[in-house]
């Protein structure tokens, strides 16, 4: 996901060649990073449906390549899609809404397949925040192809905006994921963008 956002060649041979050129020419690119509850992340962090899928993906790691996340989504949908009432504060603006997922993105891609936040940029000093309202199983399935293409953001169930700082609170702890790794459930998620935090050879 992060490689896609960076524009790095996907082939390891081409990536190594690009790295060699970058080293020789001393090319650097400063990009943003994120912090969530005191911990660093590079690509994205979220609570709700995305975190449930990440947790389920750990149970199907034996599947090859990009099949793990669709299989994990199928496992999650067997149980149904839960939603929670959230209180969200973004750069001082407060909203209270029911949501099945809140994901804060530094990069544009998630889960190897999903163009979850098409406008996201690694060097704009902002996080792209995607909120999904309560969804039925059937609606999730109809939105999956759109999420792969990045057209889901036009759906009425999706809200997209940018913020430098974000606080999400829920009455009960929800599953959390950061950069595709499951973390302990939380009832408060404090997220911020740290501009130009990383220097990469390009």
Indicate where each model-derived feature is located.
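Gly/Ser/Thr-rich active-site loops/lids in small-molecule metabolic enzymes
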Residues: 59-68, 109, 113, 118-139
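Histidine- and/or cysteine-centered catalytic micro-motif in compact active-site loops
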Residues: 91, 100, 104-109, 132-135
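Hydrophobic alpha-helical segments that either span membranes
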Residues: 1-2, 102, 128-130, 140
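Catalytic core of DAGKc-family lipid kinases
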Residues: 1-100
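A generic structural signal for short beta-strands and their flanking turns/coil linkers
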Residues: 82-84, 98-100, 123-128, 162-166
């Amino acid at each position: 996901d992060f490689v896609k956002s960076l524009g790095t060649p996907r082939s390891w041979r081409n990536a190594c060649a690009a790295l060699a050129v970058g080293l020789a020419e001393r090319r650097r690119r400063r990009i943003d990073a994120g912090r969530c509850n005191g911990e660093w992340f590079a690509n994205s962090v979220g609570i709700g449906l995305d975190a449930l899928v990440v947790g389920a993906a750990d149970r199907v790691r034996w599947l090859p390549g990009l099949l793990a996340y669709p299989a994990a989504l199928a496992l999650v949908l067997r149980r149904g899609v839960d939603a929670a009432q959230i209180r969200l504060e973004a750069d001082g603006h407060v909203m209270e809404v029911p949501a099945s997922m809140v994901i804060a993105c530094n990069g544009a891609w998630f889960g190897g397949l999903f163009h979850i936040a098409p406008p996201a940029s690694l060097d704009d000093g902002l996080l792209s925040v995607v909120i999904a309202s309560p969804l039925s199983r059937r609606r999730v399935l109809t939105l999956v192809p759109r999420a792969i293409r990045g057209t889901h953001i036009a759906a009425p169930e999706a809200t997209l905006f940018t913020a430098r700082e974000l606080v999400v609170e829920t009455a009960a702890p929800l599953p959390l994921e950061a950069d595709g790794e499951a973390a302990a459930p939380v009832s408060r998620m404090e997220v911020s963008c740290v501009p130009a935090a990383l220097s990469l050879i390009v």
